[in-house]
């Protein structure tokens, strides 16, 4: 669907740096997860059946996570390659002087991507790309499975961290959780203990952030709003819960959360949008 993220000429190395840093952090988390799954440090030890189930769950979560990342980055949410000439006659159309093109309703120009985005929601700093009409579904699924993976890792590492903390004072516990780098530099913890505390801290914080993002965008999804429309109190495209879900996730909206490559084509084109009057709905 359009140009891939890596092939977009407008984005140089600085724009890709957030994705590189995110990928490095994700690699560290995956390695830590693999370490826990294989060696199972800390009490209680995992039995063969529990280990197999944990491995299956971890593999499923990682496949969903990586699959949605690939779909997100391969989907071009911009107006590139979209035939807009002669279509800017309806209500809500505007002219973008940066792109030198008519743009449809709900579109917005991104200074980072340097192009207008169809049904623009926001620019995702962690992935270095805008969230728009064509990649909103993988973005939502990415939030869900990111929170799940990070929470899973936190639970797996919990016993090992708990055993470490119980062997020391309360002050040591607070310092290790809040200032792991300082504890490492002062020689109060080993490198392995620092890595354990740092990864747990990062995963818990990441899970909370992803969970909060999922709740917020879930609210927008049910209301048929973008972040820009929510901030300004616009409800022009709220078609009701069921129609809003289908408009953003396709007809199989209830199943797309479980597998990233499930076919669920979007009913729209990102250029024209239905309003409550178009579908005969009455909004309060």
UniProtKB/Swiss-Prot annotation:
Keywords: Acyltransferase, Lipoprotein, Membrane, Palmitate, Transferase, Transmembrane, Transmembrane helix. The keyword Transmembrane applies. Residues 94-144 form the DHHC domain. Its EC number is 2.3.1.225. It is found in: Membrane. One of its GO terms (cellular component) is membrane. Residues 40-52, 159-166, 217-284 are extracellular. Probable palmitoyltransferase that could catalyze the addition of palmitate onto various protein substrates. This is Probable palmitoyltransferase ZDHHC24. It comes from Mus musculus (Mouse). The lineage of its organism: Eukaryota, Metazoa, Chordata, Craniata, Vertebrata.
């Amino acid at each position: 669907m359009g140009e891939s993220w890596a092939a977009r000429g407008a984005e140089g190395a600085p724009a890709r740096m957030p994705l590189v840093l995110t990928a490095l952090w994700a690699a560290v988390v995956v390695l830590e997860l693999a370490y826990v799954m294989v060696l199972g440090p800390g009490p209680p030890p995992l039995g063969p059946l529990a280990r197999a189930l944990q491995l299956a769950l971890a593999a499923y979560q990682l496949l969903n996570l990586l699959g949605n990342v690939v779909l997100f980055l391969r989907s071009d949410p911009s107006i590139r390659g979209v035939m807009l000439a002669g279509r800017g006659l309806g209500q809500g159309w505007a002219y973008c002087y940066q792109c030198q093109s008519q743009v449809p309703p709900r579109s917005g120009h991104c200074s980072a991507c340097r192009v207008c985005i169809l049904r623009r929601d926001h620019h995702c700093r962690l992935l270095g790309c805008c969230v728009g009409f064509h990649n909103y579904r993988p973005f939502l699924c990415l939030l869900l499975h990111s929170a799940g993976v990070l929470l899973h890792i936190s639970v797996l590492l919990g016993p090992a961290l708990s055993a470490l903390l119980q062997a020391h004072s309360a002050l040591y516990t607070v310092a290790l959780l809040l200032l792991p780098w300082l504890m490492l530099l002062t020689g109060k913890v080993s490198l392995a203990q620092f890595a354990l505390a740092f990864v747990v801290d990062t995963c818990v914080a990441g899970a909370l952030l992803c969970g909060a993002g999922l709740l917020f965008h879930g609210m927008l999804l049910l209301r048929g709003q973008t972040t820009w429309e929510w901030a300004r109190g616009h409800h022009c495209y709220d078609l009701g819960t069921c129609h809003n879900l289908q408009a953003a996730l396709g007809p199989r909206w209830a199943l797309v959360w479980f597998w990233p490559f499930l076919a669920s084509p979007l009913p729209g084109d990102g250029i024209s949008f239905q309003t409550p009057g178009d579908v005969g709905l009455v909004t309060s």
